[in-house]
UniProtKB/Swiss-Prot annotation:
PANTHER family: OJ000223_09.16 PROTEIN. Residues 25-72 form the F-box domain. It comes from the Eukaryota. This is Putative F-box protein At1g57690.
C-alpha cells in the first residue's frame, strides 16, 4: 500500500509569494559548510560554478578557482583533478596542488599539457595520496633527492618520458601495487633496462624495435605462484613476437627458458635483426631462441666476459651454409 503521508511541496504562483521568497535567505545557503563542499566538489569545476545561480552564498566567489577553493574548509579531500593547457596558469599549479595536499587528498590527477621546468617540486613527502595520475614530463617533477609516498598504491603515467631518475620515485613508494603496466600504442621503440620490477606490456601494438636488458621478470623477493609466472611471461612474449629488431640479454633468455620448462609455450618471433648481449650464456637457451626466429637475417653477439671467443665460434658454425649474417659486437 502506498504511503499517503508524504509531504507535498507546492510552488507559489502568485506575485506576492514570489516577492516574499525573493527577500528570504535561500535554503541552500543555510546548509553547513561540510555538506555544501561535498555537493560542490562532486562536480567538475565548470558545473560547480554554474550552481551559483541557485545560491547567493558562493555566487560572488565562483568566478575563479582560487576563490572556489577558499570555500573548502573540510580537513579531508578524496579527489583532486587538475587539467591545464595554458602557460599562463603555471603560477597557480603550486598553490592548487599544495592546497590539495594540505587536505590529505587520496586520489590526485595532474594533466599539464605543456613543458616547463618551473613546475614546483612540492610533494617530496606525502602520506595521504593513494592514487596518483600524471600526464606531464617527469623531468619536470622528479625531486633531486627522490620522494617518500608511503601510502601510494596506484601510479599512472601518460604522454611522458621516463628519465633515469624515475627510479627515485619507484624506490620511494613501498606499497605500490605491481606489476608495472605499459600502455603505449603509438611508440615504435621500447627499451627496458636494469630493472627488477615486474612489468606487463598492455598495448605496444606499433612496436618495431625492442630492447630487454638485465631485467628480472620474476624477482626473488616476491612470491609468485607458477600460474602467475606462466601468464606474465606468455603475455610479454606475445607483445614482442611481431618486433623486427630485437635485443635480449642473457638473463632474459634464462627467464624464457625457465618459463618454457614450467609449461609456457615458446612463441614464434618475426624478428629479422637479433642482438644478444651476453654476460653468461647457456647454449640451449640460445638455440631455443634461434629455432623460434625463422625470419632472422642478422645476428649480433656482444659478449662481456672471457667466454666471448667460444660463444663466437659457436655462432660462426651456425652461419656456415645459411643466409644468416653474423656480426660480432664489441
Amino acid at each position: 500500500m502506498a504511503d499517503n503521508s508524504a509531504t507535498r511541496v507546492r510552488v507559489p504562483s502568485d506575485r506576492n509569494s514570489r516577492r516574499k521568497i525573493k527577500g528570504e535567505v535561500d535554503i541552500i545557503s543555510s546548509l553547513p559548510d561540510v555538506i555544501l563542499q561535498h555537493i560542490l566538489f562532486s562536480f567538475q569545476t565548470k558545473y560547480a560554478i554554474r550552481t551559483s545561480v541557485l545560491s547567493k552564498r558562493w555566487r560572488h566567489e565562483a568566478d575563479a578557482i582560487n576563490k572556489a577553493l577558499s570555500q573548502y574548509t573540510a580537513p579531508k579531500m578524496m579527489n583532486f583533478h587538475l587539467k591545464i593547457n595554458k602557460n599562463n596558469s603555471l603560477h597557480h599549479i603550486k598553490k592548487w596542488t599544495e592546497f590539495a595536499m594540505s587536505r590529505n587528498v587520496e586520489n590526485m590527477s595532474l594533466d599539464v599539457r605543456f613543458r616547463s621546468n618551473k613546475i614546483p617540486r612540492f610533494y617530496e613527502i606525502n602520506s595521504s595520496v593513494k592514487s596518483l595520475s600524471h600526464r606531464l614530463d617527469l623531468h619536470d617533477v622528479i625531486p633531486r633527492h627522490g620522494v617518500s609516498w608511503t601510502s601510494l598504491k596506484k601510479f599512472s603515467l601518460s604522454y611522458c618520458g621516463l628519465p633515469d631518475e624515475s627510479a627515485k620515485i619507484l624506490s620511494g613508494c613501498p606499497i605500490l601495487e605491481w606489476p608495472m603496466q605499459i600502455v603505449a600504442p603509438q611508440i615504435h621503440c621500447l627499451k627496458l633496462r636494469n630493472t627488477q620490477l615486474p612489468c606487463t606490456l598492455v598495448d605496444v601494438s606499433s612496436l618495431t624495435e625492442a630492447e630487454v636488458l638485465d631485467i628480472i621478470i620474476f624477482p626473488v623477493n616476491l612470491s609468485y605462484n607458477a600460474d602467475f609466472l606462466h601468464a606474465t611471461m606468455l603475455e610479454m612474449l606475445k607483445k614482442l613476437k611481431n618486433v623486427e629488431k630485437l635485443t635480449f640479454s642473457g638473463s632474459y633468455l634464462q627467464n624464457l627458458s625457465v618459463a618454457e620448462k614450467r609449461g609456457v609455450p615458446f612463441p614464434m618471433f618475426k624478428v629479422k635483426a637479433l642482438t644478444l648481449e651476453m654476460k653468461h650464456f647457456v647454449i640451449s637457451d640460445i638455440e631455443r631462441m634461434l629455432q623460434s626466429s625463422p625470419n632472422l637475417k642478422k645476428l649480433t653477439v656482444r659478449a662481456k666476459d672471457n667466454t666471448g671467443k667460444y660463444l663466437y665460434r659457436y655462432f660462426a658454425r651456425l652461419e656456415s651454409g645459411s643466409m644468416l649474417e653474423l656480426k660480432k659486437g664489441v
